[in-house]
Amino acid sequence: MIEALPSGIVLGLIPITLAGLFVTAYSQYRRGDQLDI
């Protein structure tokens, strides 16, 4: 049970991290389009 908690935390953080990276990349992509215009 002791090892289940860290693994659960990691499994919970991975989607959040991927979502954060996607939002950051998307926002930078949108800024690039606005600057190009």
UniProtKB/Swiss-Prot annotation:
One Pfam entry for this protein is PetG
Return the GO cellular component terms, semicolon-separated: chloroplast thylakoid membrane; cytochrome b6f complex
Single annotated GO MF: electron transporter, transferring electrons within cytochrome b6/f complex of photosystem II activity
- Name the membrane topology term: Single-pass membrane protein
Q: List residues traversing the bilayer.
A: 5-25
Its main localization is: plastid
| UniProt keyword list | Chloroplast, Electron transport, Membrane, Photosynthesis, Plastid, Thylakoid, Transmembrane, Transmembrane helix, Transport
GO aspect biological process, one term: photosynthesis
Q: Where in the cell is it found?
A: Plastid, Chloroplast thylakoid membrane
Tell me, what does this protein do in biology?
Answer: Component of the cytochrome b6-f complex, which mediates electron transfer between photosystem II (PSII) and photosystem I (PSI), cyclic electron flow around PSI, and state transitions. PetG is required for either the stability or assembly of the cytochrome b6-f complex.
**Which family is this protein grouped under?**
Belongs to the PetG family.
Subunit field text: The 4 large subunits of the cytochrome b6-f complex are cytochrome b6, subunit IV (17 kDa polypeptide, PetD), cytochrome f and the Rieske protein, while the 4 small subunits are PetG, PetL, PetM and PetN. The complex functions as a dimer.
HAMAP family assigned to the protein according to its UniProt record, in alphabetical order: Cytb6_f_PetG
Question: What's this protein's name?
Answer: Cytochrome b6-f complex subunit 5
Gene transcribed to yield this protein: petG
